[in-house]
Amino acid sequence: MKRGELYRVRRPPGDPKLARVFVIASRQPLIDSTFSTVVCAPVFTQYHGLPTQVSVGTAEGLKHESAIQCDGLMSLEKSRLTDYVGELTFDKLRELDDALLVALALPARKQASI
């Protein structure tokens, strides 16, 4: 299990859908620990171009063009993340990082000077 992997979760808590895809947003040391939950962001089929959304699609293993919704973070039991869908590329992980910064109102990362 790695940060940036997408999993289909059956009957997510508080969600009317029978299944929803989530991407793991937690840092890798937490994922590798004995802690039972990880922070995940849900994936929805609608993309509105918000700075808290990341567009994803067939390249990430999904059937349709969709969007990671960083405003809807949830803590999910690792044991529920069993139906692997795909994973984000390095560039998509960077987009996820940027969207999480906006969603959590964190200061922007400083650019490295050359």
Predicted feature locations:
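Conserved functional hotspots at enzyme active or ligand-binding sites that engage polyanionic ligands
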Residues: 1-114
